[in-house]
Amino acid sequence: MFIDSEYSSFLIINVTFFAVKLLQFGLVWLAPRTFDTSTHLFLEHYGITSNPWWGKLLSWDSIFFLKTSLWMRNSGYSAPQYEHEWAFSPIWSIIIQSSDLQHIVLKAVSFNLLLHYLSTWIVYALTKLTFPPFGQNVQTKLALTTSVLFILSSAAGFLISVYSEPIAFTFSLLGMLFRQWSISFDVYGNLHMDKLKWISYLLSSFCFAFAFLNRSNCLLLGLFYVHDCLNLFKQKKWITSIFYPILSGTILFGVFVYFHYYFPYAALCPERGEWCNSKIYGLPIPYQSLYSYIQSKHWNVGFLKYWTPNNIPNFLFGLPNIVITWNAITYFSYQYPSRNMKPYIWIARIFLFIMVFLANVQIINRVSSFLPLSLWYISDSLIKNPHEMRIVKYYVMWLLIWIPTQTALFACFLPPA
């Protein structure tokens, strides 16, 4: 029975994944040429004029990853050419480097398909490890439903392009899996670390750090270590806290300081001025990270800056994920409280606050994929209360409409970005 259940999961996940991707690429192929000519001008500069396929996969920010990758390969530099390009994962641009532009696109799209597929199975394993086996079939069904929902991501068209979301959420989820495998809770809610799995716990920090290098919101994953540290402090396990969460958190924080402060300062300053001049006590570290500075200056990111009448459509685009994330937080805080869920809830609360009050709110549809809390809420609701959870049903219906719609809009270079 168990083997049959696992085989069914394998079959359903594979069929769903490849069916969704075929549908998306079919929509891209059928989409009309984009009204925006900036991508075509960029491609023509590199001698690609005959195939409109490339232009359809390179909408919105995709072009920045390509341009930086080409710049690094041709110039020999390990940093972007212009200040605003630092906001688009230089690490991902290095990874997708190739001999020419067409090969870069092919490499990036292939990597993203592979990463999305692999991360689907990571979600499957993480779900089975996180939730107690009340019954093998129930646990497997929860993992299967979560994995299918992960395939049906609201990121849609962004996941078949050159964006860095897939590599970010793959390593985010892998880090969660490593951490979850290393810990356990007793009936009193006390955290216990398996000393034989110390390397696994430490590996989670490297995964989170690499995810952060590709998507800055993954810095919030450091809250896992804050949670673990506080729990161990309560038990007065000082040595364990030092060698587990404190060491792991220090690695993540060190990567943050180096790549968002010191490295860009060394590359841009003192010639840049402005950002370079706001140093902390004369150290080569400005008060504000370069990423925050770029977001504020070039994309008008800041508290309530996005709360303007012309951005109402963008709030509507992001509303389904805002509502489902809020419901997931409430569900796991009160209706299904679990020690395992506590750090996920912390991360989701801060993430939701940032998305609604500080960021360009519509990007929640693609960047929320780094955290599986909402997927677990939907899956658990569909299994336990299939006839009562109206909001969950509406969200799933919205996904089924949104994925093909957004993919087609993306291929035509139309909002939302």
Swiss-Prot record:
Principal place of residence: endoplasmic reticulum
Catalytic class of the enzyme: transferase
Record field: transmembrane: 10-30, 104-124, 142-162, 167-187, 206-226, 239-259, 312-332, 344-364, 394-414
Known pathway: Glycolipid biosynthesis; glycosylphosphatidylinositol-anchor biosynthesis
Keywords: Endoplasmic reticulum, Glycosyltransferase, GPI-anchor biosynthesis, Membrane, Transferase, Transmembrane, Transmembrane helix
Entries under InterPro entries matching the protein: PIG-V/Gpi18
MF (Gene Ontology): alpha-1,6-mannosyltransferase activity; glycolipid mannosyltransferase activity
Gene Ontology CC: one annotated term: mannosyltransferase complex
Enzyme Commission number(s): 2.4.1.-
Any Pfam family matching the protein: Mannosyl_trans2
Cell compartment(s), UniProt: Endoplasmic reticulum membrane
Domain of life: Eukaryota
GO biological process: GPI anchor biosynthetic process
Keyword Transferase part of the UniProt annotation: yes
Membrane topology of the entry: Multi-pass membrane protein
Task performed by this protein: Mannosyltransferase involved in glycosylphosphatidylinositol-anchor biosynthesis. Transfers the second mannose to the glycosylphosphatidylinositol during GPI precursor assembly.
Family: Belongs to the PIGV family.
PANTHER family documented for this protein: GPI MANNOSYLTRANSFERASE 2 (PTHR12468:SF2)
Annotated protein name in UniProt: GPI mannosyltransferase 2
UniProt source species: Kluyveromyces lactis (strain ATCC 8585 / CBS 2359 / DSM 70799 / NBRC 1267 / NRRL Y-1140 / WM37) (Yeast)
